C-alpha cells in the first residue's frame, strides 16, 4: 500500500512540477514556522568556542564581492574537509576557496593546514603542492590507488582536479593522466569517492550544478528568476540550463573511465545537483547515491548490483517535501537518528521553508518526519552544511547545520533576511523528537555567511568539533568544550580486500540498550568531507559491541570494546562470514 501511495504522489508531483509557475529563481514553499514548544530543561553539556585565530587558520575563503552578487556563481561557495593526509593520527584541515570576477586577491587559494597536535595548525599549502586559484566547489577524500595515503578530488567551475597523495607530505595533480580532464567547461558541484561495483577500487561520482557562462547570464532583476522579496538579485538557478551528472569507474591502474551512460546516470532527467552522498540506504550491501538538488526534485540512484543504477527518489519518498513541492536542497546529513540501524537523511533548504528529515524504513523508502520531529520551528535561514552527529556524547545523534543568505542586497531593504546568520543545533530528545537550542556557546550564536562544514575531532579529546567555511572570511574552527562524564568510542577502519579507506563500511554499535548504525562516507554536509573515523557517543555505557560489514562482504564482530578510546580496526584478509 505504501509503494502504491508513493507512485501516486510521484505522478502527481511530476505533473504539478511541469505546470507550476515560478516567481523567483529558487524554490521556497513560503511556509510559516511551527510554534515552539516548552523547552525540555535538560542540560546540554556541549559548548562551542571559536578558536580560529589562535589555531592559525588565517586565510579567508574568497567568493565574489561582499556587498552584492551579480552572478549565481558568486553565491554558492564551497566546502572543506577534516583529513589525516600524513597518517599521524591527527586530522588536518583543508579549506577550499573561490575567486572574484574582477580577479582574486593576492594569496587566494585552497588551503591545507597541518595539525600541530597542540591546538594549532601550520599552513602547508605551497609545500604540499596545492596552491590553486579558481572557483572551487567540493572535495571528497579517499585512497583511490590503495597505497595507504588519502587522495583528494576537488570540483570547480572550469575543471575538476584529482590530487594524488605522494606519501611524503606532497600532492601531485594527476587529472590528465587519470583520464579525468574534461573537454568542456563544467560547473562541478558535489562529488564522492564510492566503490559502486565493489571491486576494491574507489570510483568517482560527480554532480554538475548547471550550465553557466558569464557572457550569456542575465543581469540582476532582468526577469522573475532574478528577484527575491521584490529586490533585484542574481539570476537562477531556475531559468538556467541543467547539467548532467557523471560516474567514473576506477580501472585499478590509476586511470578512470566515464561510464555515466552505460550505468544509467546520464539518462536520468537532469536537476540542479549539489551535495552528493554515497551510502547504502536500502541495506543490501551495495552503495547507492543521493543528490540534494536545488529547486528541482532530489535524486536517489539505487545500485542494481550489475554496474547500473535506477533513479528512485520520487518512488521512495526522498525527492520532494511531504506536500509534493520542490525544495532548494543544499546540504545533507546522514545518520541513524532513531537508533534502529538505518541511515536517515537530513537535508537543508532555503529561507521561508523547513529543512527536511527523511526517516528510513530499512528498505530504502523514506517518510518525511519534519513536522513530527519538531524541525518545523525554524524557517528563517538559508541552510547549507549539515550533519547528524552526537555533539554531547549522550548516545543520541543530534542535528547541526550552518546558515547564510545568498543575497546581500536584500538585507538593507528587507531587514528580516540578513546575509549573515547563526549556526543551528537541534538536540535529539529520543524517539525522533528534537528541540532547537538557542544557547550552545558563542561559536553557535556568531553570524556569518557560511557554506560548507565538516565534523571531526581535531584535538583527539573524544568529542565532535566543527570546521565551517565562511564567505570572504577565514573559516571557523569550533572546539567542542564538552563537560560531563558521557563515554565515547571512535573507530578508524582500514580496508584490505575492500578499498583502503573503507568507504562504504557499515558499523553497528550496540551500547547499553541502544543500537546505532554509521557508515564511512566520502562526502556529506555541503560539499565537504568529515573526519572518516566514526564517532559514537555512548552515554553512560562503558563498553560497546561492534558489528562491521566491510564493502567486500566480510562481516566482523568485536565484543566488549572499552569506551573512551580511538580504535583502529583492520579488515580480516579472508572473508570471515560469507554472505
Show where each model-derived region lies.
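Beta-propeller blade termini
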Residues: 77-87, 136-146, 188-198, 202, ...
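Short glycine/acidic-enriched loop and turn motifs that connect beta-strands
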Residues: 99-102, 211-213, 296, 352, ...
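Hydrophobic beta-strand segments that make up the repeating blades of beta-propeller
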Residues: 93-97, 151-156, 204-208, 289-292, ...
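Gly/Ser/Thr/Pro-enriched helix-cap/hinge segments flanking short amphipathic alpha-helices
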Residues: 46-47, 65, 373, 408, ...
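Structural signal for beta-propeller blades
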Residues: 110, 160-162, 245, 297-300, ...
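N-terminal secretory signal peptides and thylakoid transit peptides that target proteins
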Residues: 1-16, 22
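Short, solvent-exposed loop/turn segments at conserved positions within beta-propeller repeat blades
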Residues: 103-108, 157-158, 238-243, 295-296, ...
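Blade-edge motifs of beta-propeller repeat domains
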Residues: 24-74, 113-134, 164-186, 217-271, ...
Amino acid at each position: 500500500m505504501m509503494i502504491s501511495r508513493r507512485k501516486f504522489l510521484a505522478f502527481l508531483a511530476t505533473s504539478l512540477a511541469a505546470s507550476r509557475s515560478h516567481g523567483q529563481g529558487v524554490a521556497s514553499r513560503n511556509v510559516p514556522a511551527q510554534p515552539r514548544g516548552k523547552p525540555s530543561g535538560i542540560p546540554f553539556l556541549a559548548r562551542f568556542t571559536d578558536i580560529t585565530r589562535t589555531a592559525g587558520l588565517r586565510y579567508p575563503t574568497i567568493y565574489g564581492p561582499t556587498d552584492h552578487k551579480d552572478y549565481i556563481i558568486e553565491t554558492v561557495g564551497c566546502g572543506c574537509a577534516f583529513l589525516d593526509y600524513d597518517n599521524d593520527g591527527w586530522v588536518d584541515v583543508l579549506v577550499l576557496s573561490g575567486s572574484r570576477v574582477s580577479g582574486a586577491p593576492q594569496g587566494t587559494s585552497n588551503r591545507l593546514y597541518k595539525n600541530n597536535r597542540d591546538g594549532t595548525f601550520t599552513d602547508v599549502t605551497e609545500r604540499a603542492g596545492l596552491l590553486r586559484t579558481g572557483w572551487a566547489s567540493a572535495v571528497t577524500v579517499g585512497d583511490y590507488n590503495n597505497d595507504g595515503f588519502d587522495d583528494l578530488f576537488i570540483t570547480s567551475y572550469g575543471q575538476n582536479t584529482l590530487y594524488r597523495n605522494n606519501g611524503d607530505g606532497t600532492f601531485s595533480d594527476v587529472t590528465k593522466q587519470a583520464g579525468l580532464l574534461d573537454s568542456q567547461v563544467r560547473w562541478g558541484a558535489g562529488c564522492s569517492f564510492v566503490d559502486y561495483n565493489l571491486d576494491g577500487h574507489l570510483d568517482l561520482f560527480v554532480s554538475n550544478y548547471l550550465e553557466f557562462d558569464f557572457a550569456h547570464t542575465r543581469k540582476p532583476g532582468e526577469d522573475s528568476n532574478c528577484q527575491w522579496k521584490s529586490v533585484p538579485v542574481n539570476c537562477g538557478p531556475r531559468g538556467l540550463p541543467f547539467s548532467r551528472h557523471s560516474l567514473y569507474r576506477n580501472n585499478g591502474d590509476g586511470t578512470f573511465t566515464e561510464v555515466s551512460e552505460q550505468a544509467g546516470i546520464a539518462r536520468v532527467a537532469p536537476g540542479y545537483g549539489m551535495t552528493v552522498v554515497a551510502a547504502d540506504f536500502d541495506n543490501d550491501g551495495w552503495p547507492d547515491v543521493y543528490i540534494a538538488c536545488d529547486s528541482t526534485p532530489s535524486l536517489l540512484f539505487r545500485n542494481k548490483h550489475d554496474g547500473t543504477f535506477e533513479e528512485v527518489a520520487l518512488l521512495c519518498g526522498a525527492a520532494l517535501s511531504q506536500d509534493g513541492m520542490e525544495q532548494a536542497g543544499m546540504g545533507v546529513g546522514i545518520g541513524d537518528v532513531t537508533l534502529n540501524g538505518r541511515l536517515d537523511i537530513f537535508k537543508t533548504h532555503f529561507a521561508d521553508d523547513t529543512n527536511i528529515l527523511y526517516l528510513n524504513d530499512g528498505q530504502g523508502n523514506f517518510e518525511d518526519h519534519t513536522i513530527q520531529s519538531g524541525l518545523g520551528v525554524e524557517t528563517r535561514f538559508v541552510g547549507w552544511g549539515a550533519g547528524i552527529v552526537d555533539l554531547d556524547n549522550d548516545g543520541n545523534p543530534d542535528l547541526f547545520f550552518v546558515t547564510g543568505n545568498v543575497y546581500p542586497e536584500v538585507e538593507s531593504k528587507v531587514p528580516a533576511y540578513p546575509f549573515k546568520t547563526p549556526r543551528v543545533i537541534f538536540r535529539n530528545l529520543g524517539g525522533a523528537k528534537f528541540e532547537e537550542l538557542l544557547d550552545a556557546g558563542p561559536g553557535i550564536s556568531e553570524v556569518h555567511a557560511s557554506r560548507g562544514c565538516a565534523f571531526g575531532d581535531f584535538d583527539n579529546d573524544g568529542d565532535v568539533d566543527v570546521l565551517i567555511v565562511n564567505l570572504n572570511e577565514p573559516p571557523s574552527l569550533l572546539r567542542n568544550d564538552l563537560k560531563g562524564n558521557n563515554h565515547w568510542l571512535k573507530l578508524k577502519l582500514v580496508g584490505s580486500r575492500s578499498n583502503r579507506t573503507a568507504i562504504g563500511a557499515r558499523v553497528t554499535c550496540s551500547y547499553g540498550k541502544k543500537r546505532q548504525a554509521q557508515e564511512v562516507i566520502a562526502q556529506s554536509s555541503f560539499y565537504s568531507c568529515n573526519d572518516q573515523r566514526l564517532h559514537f557517543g555512548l552515554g553512560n555505557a562503558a563498553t560497546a559491541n561492534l558489528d562491521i560489514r566491510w564493502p567486500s562482504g566480510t562481516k566482523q564482530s568485536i565484543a566488549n570494546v572499552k569506551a573512551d578510546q580511538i580504535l583502529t580496526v583492520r579488515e580480516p584478509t579472508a572473508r570471515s562470514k560469507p554472505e
